[in-house]
Amino acid sequence: MKGRSDGGQKKRVIALVCVAAVVLVFVYLFYGSSDHRASAIEYGRKLGLGGDDDDTKQDDTSSSFGVDDGFTPRSFPVCDDRHSELIPCLDRNLIYQMRLKLDLSLMEHYERHCPPPERRFNCLIPPPNGYKVPIKWPKSRDEVWKVNIPHTHLAHEKSDQNWMVVKGDKINFPGGGTHFHYGADKYIASMANMLNYPNNVLNNGGRLRTVFDVGCGVASFGGYLLSSDILTMSLAPNDVHQNQIQFALERGIPASLGVLGTKRLPYPSRSFELSHCSRCRIDWLQRDGILLLELDRVLRPGGYFAYSSPEAYAQDEEDLRIWREMSALVERMCWKIAAKRNQTVIWQKPLTNDCYLEREPGTQPPLCRSDNDPDAVWGVNMEACITSYSDHDHKTKGSGLAPWPARLTSPPPRLADFGYSTGMFEKDTELWRQRVDTYWDLLSPRIESDTVRNIMDMKASMGSFAAALKEKDVWVMNVVPEDGPNTLKLIYDRGLMGAVHSWCEAFSTYPRTYDLLHAWDIISDIKKKGCSEVDLLLEMDRILRPSGFIIIRDKQRVVDFVKKYLKALHWEEVGTKTDSDSDQDSDNVVFIVQKKLWLTSESLRDME
């Protein structure tokens, strides 16, 4: 018995040793002696892409904002392929891991929840297997590479609505939508006809320029408005129709991730001439109409809300109830029906405060308190109240904006809110026109007329950088930092668009969104705020497309700092120029880099 027992113990020990050995082998194969994720990178050189200076030694004397630590990072680890579409502040896995107590009925799970520093992915986001340089605009409006967004769920789910169709190695967009199966162009012309606009053109001679499309699908509505010189902020959450915004951005159509939940939208008051909801599945009656009141906040005086939904036409009991209650709500908000036809109703917001002042005492929703700043949006909760106009706006009876394109260069009426003069505005516009000319001179050896489509200005001020790009076939997401002057309303008054954001956090967009980032003093600013400049560089890399460009306009010490990370980030220098065009930025340097197209070794094996 003793010998038999000893033999059994020996067998168990041998089995445990074998299991441990197998585990160790797997650990070694996965991580490797030099970190699997970091060493797996193969440069574009192997694919005949990108630059040829990967082995160039970095300058170890570069200082980190004036502190020479002698450290030059050789590489960043590469994130797991599962994170190729990571949006750090809209990460459902993070919500689960942190056990956040969120109210799903209020859409809090679709709002921003950013990881604390110890949970950030300090790694490079890999492109999907077989990634290709995106199709160029304007062809991209109608087709994209399937391999770049390998999700065909929507094509099957919405096959009867013409959202998108898979054809070989591409995904085509016929221009349909849930409400406009036969094309957005016909639907748009019908709306213009309802409003009696000349020639059924919705821009109304340039008077209607900025549009907000909530629950936008793949943004075909906004895409087809571009030909009418109408700029649309297409918004949708990363919900069950996941990747709809990613498709929009891959197409070269302005779009952003977001939701009408509990926080204000990151746009100032009086930003849009038209808001649009086509079968957007939003309960507008919830919480005393708070979501409809948020739309009211961002609409200009006399602005429209176009609503295409069964509630506007269906005759069943439930839809009729919703229609009655919604009609009563907007009437108390002083909206009037501008037009109603078939399945669409278009309401109009009042031009002045007259109707608000004539309401019976105690009428709900109430007017917002006088200390409620309608332009404070970053992390600010929505309120179920009506944003009335200032005395100046009430007397003006409208926005006072010039029609597009004169609007772009006309001094915005809200300049006075910042104490800016017309002369300052005109000088700023001319200064950035000259700067953009310089940028394109530096970029010209690397770009063609269609190389760049999606652009972000990371610190947009009055929007003059974007204004200088008017003659180019591009669109610009103008970002205004949350802790500076809220000049975003000037940007919207110029017929441009953008969002308020803190660069201490990740932006609400997918990886590989932008062809060009403009970073004016933003790296210096982030350092002053005590946030990580390395995290910012990784975020810039995340949202930049492979082969995309970054224009850094900052202090020489900042440029020296960035140069230390070029090799690790797989960026290469395109050009440098000392800034000598203004006293304000006399010590600034223009430094342009290009992101290389690289693939992981797993991707290369799949290609072989």
UniProtKB/Swiss-Prot annotation:
It comes from the Eukaryota. Co-expressed with the galacturonosyltransferase GAUT1. Keywords: Glycoprotein, Golgi apparatus, Membrane, Methyltransferase, Signal-anchor, Transferase, Transmembrane, Transmembrane helix. SUPFAM superfamilies: S-adenosyl-L-methionine-dependent methyltransferases. The chain crosses the membrane at residues 13-33. It is found in: Golgi apparatus membrane. GO terms for cellular component: endosome; Golgi apparatus; Golgi membrane; Golgi trans cisterna; plasmodesma; trans-Golgi network. Its EC number is 2.1.1.-. It is a single-pass type II membrane protein. Residues 34-608 are lumenal. Belongs to the methyltransferase superfamily. It comes from Arabidopsis thaliana (Mouse-ear cress). GO terms for biological process: methylation. Residues 1-12 are cytoplasmic. This is Probable methyltransferase PMT3. Glycans are attached at residue 342. It holds the Pfam family Methyltransf_29. GO terms for molecular function: methyltransferase activity.
